[in-house]
């Protein structure tokens, strides 16, 4: 038994302007080399672009996009008897959101375009509509889990 106390789970802080935890999670994932102010600039510009494109509440578009990309199930490599199986596992809400944000940012970075704010806004709008690379990644993950359903008992 461990002599150390268990670590308390940290709660995600909210950003200063929108008071939203999802925005803060997005800022922390988009940040590179500790440049948080630049990450905030990119996010806020992307939010303005979403406002201009859709003429709706940009935070609802963000929520809808993340909800659409969040996976319910994923596969995890598990070594059993000398061979590695892809075992489907259920994903919790926090981990699912983190994966969704990672996929959205990855898809945004791959997009052709002028700047990151433009690419991110386009990807978020597409994801909210149900298309885009991030949605495709989620569907691919679900297909993999479905194909490897026979190994679900290896959990």
Swiss-Prot record:
Q: Which keywords appear in this protein's UniProt record, sorted alphabetically?
A: Chloroplast, Plastid, Ribonucleoprotein, Ribosomal protein, RNA-binding, rRNA-binding
* UniProt-listed GO biological process terms: translation
User: Tell me, what is one Gene Ontology molecular-function annotation carried by this entry?
Assistant: rRNA binding
Keyword Transferase part of the UniProt annotation: no
- Cystine pairings recorded for this chain: none
Q: What GO CC annotations are associated with the protein?
A: chloroplast; small ribosomal subunit
- A Pfam family cross-referenced in the UniProt record is Ribosomal_S7
- Gene3D superfamilies in the cross-refs: Ribosomal protein S7 domain
In its keyword annotation, does this UniProt entry include Disulfide bond?
no
Its localization reads: Plastid, Chloroplast
Question: What coarse category fits the chief subcellular location reported for this protein?
Answer: plastid
The job of this chain, per UniProt, is described as: One of the primary rRNA binding proteins, it binds directly to 16S rRNA where it nucleates assembly of the head domain of the 30S subunit.
Can you state the subunit structure given in the record? Part of the 30S ribosomal subunit.
Q: Which HAMAP family does the annotation name?
A: Ribosomal_uS7_B
State the family it belongs to.
Belongs to the universal ribosomal protein uS7 family.
Name of protein: Small ribosomal subunit protein uS7c
Which organism encodes this protein?
Typha angustifolia
Classification from the root reads: Eukaryota, Viridiplantae, Streptophyta, Embryophyta, Tracheophyta
What is the gene called?
rps7
